[in-house]
């Protein structure tokens, strides 16, 4: 059994770690609430612009934008949004498993996959596997902006226009609630067509005159929509990161508390044994006299 002094040192060390994990838990909780607000405020924009695109595309009779037309898939592009930091449980691991499983399915169909990575964790992981990376961005921080993400979006848009990829997917962790975050894979280009229920009550083509031209408007709207989708994914992934970190740090704090209790019992036993030995020595000495 370890000595009382050694056990006291261990207890002090665990208590110090417990303070750090508790502080990290509180910081993550605060950041998660702020990110949730940004996430909620950005969703209506994405949904509305998607509806506008659907109506405008129906107004351009005889014109089909390339982003709205399905192709035969021979090459796939994926924009993968991960975290820049760790200590968030299995969040990134589950995300990477989703990407690798999808890549495996495409490989079995003899389809190549290119990745555009956002977040240092995904960059480090996929570089270590030697997978072809089209673009990479990291360090977006706790308040991501469209300007920080536009490089990944534009690279995939250019690749799609040039025929270097035939379909583009967006992969990120979707925030369900504080205890649940789910890796999702969503089709980004070509855009899935909205059904009548998603369009709402206004199912008819808008009878508007577009200036300068509906095609020009549609081109701009589609790019803005793709940017907003990647931004939304980055914000959702950030909220998922903070929630996962908060849960992980709470578990670490609780485990530290349990370990302290166990060490305290060991310390008490060691101290009791030490006192008992001292008493035995005193009694033995008195008997010898």
From Swiss-Prot:
It is a peripheral membrane protein. Keywords: ATP synthesis, Cell inner membrane, Cell membrane, CF(1), Hydrogen ion transport, Ion transport, Membrane, Transport. It is found in: Cell inner membrane. GO terms for cellular component: plasma membrane; proton-transporting ATP synthase complex. It holds the Pfam family ATP-synt. CDD domains: F1-ATPase_gamma (cd12151). GO terms for biological process: proton motive force-driven plasma membrane ATP synthesis. The keyword Transport applies. NCBIfam families: ATPsyn_F1gamma (TIGR01146), PRK05621.1-1 (NF004144). Belongs to the ATPase gamma chain family. F-type ATPases have 2 components, CF(1) - the catalytic core - and CF(0) - the membrane proton channel. CF(1) has five subunits: alpha(3), beta(3), gamma(1), delta(1), epsilon(1). CF(0) has three main subunits: a, b and c. This is ATP synthase gamma chain.
């Amino acid at each position: 059994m370890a000595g009382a002094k050694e056990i006291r040192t261990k207890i002090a060390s665990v208590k110090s770690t417990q303070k750090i994990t508790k502080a990290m838990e509180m910081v993550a909780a605060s950041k998660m609430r702020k990110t949730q607000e940004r996430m909620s405020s950005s969703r209506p924009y994405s949904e509305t612009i998607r509806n506008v695109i659907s109506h405008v595309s129906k107004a351009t009779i005889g014109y089909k934008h390339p982003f709205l037309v399905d192709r035969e898939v021979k090459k796939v592009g994926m924009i993968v949004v991960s975290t820049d930091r760790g200590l968030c449980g299995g969040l990134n691991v589950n995300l990477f498993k989703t990407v690798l499983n999808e890549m495996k399915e495409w490989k079995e169909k003899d389809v190549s996959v290119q990745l555009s990575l956002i977040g240092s964790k995904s960059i480090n992981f996929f570089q270590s596997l030697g997978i072809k990376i089209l673009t990479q961005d990291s360090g977006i921080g706790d308040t991501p902006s469209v300007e920080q993400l536009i490089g990944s979006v534009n690279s995939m848009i250019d690749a799609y226009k040039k025929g270097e990829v035939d379909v583009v997917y967006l992969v990120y962790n979707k925030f369900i609630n504080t205890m649940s975050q789910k890796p999702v894979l969503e089709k980004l280009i070509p855009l899935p067509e909205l059904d009548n229920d998603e369009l709402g009550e206004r199912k008819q083509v808008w009878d508007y005159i577009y200036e300068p031209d509906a095609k020009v408007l549609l081109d701009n709207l589609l790019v803005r929509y793709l940017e907003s989708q990647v931004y939304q994914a980055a914000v959702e992934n950030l909220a998922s990161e903070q929630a996962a970190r908060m849960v992980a740090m709470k578990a670490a704090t609780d485990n530290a508390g349990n370990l302290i209790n166990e060490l305290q019992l060991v310390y008490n036993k060691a101290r009791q044994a030490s006192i008992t030995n001292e008493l035995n020595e005193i009694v033995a000495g008195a008997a010898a006299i």
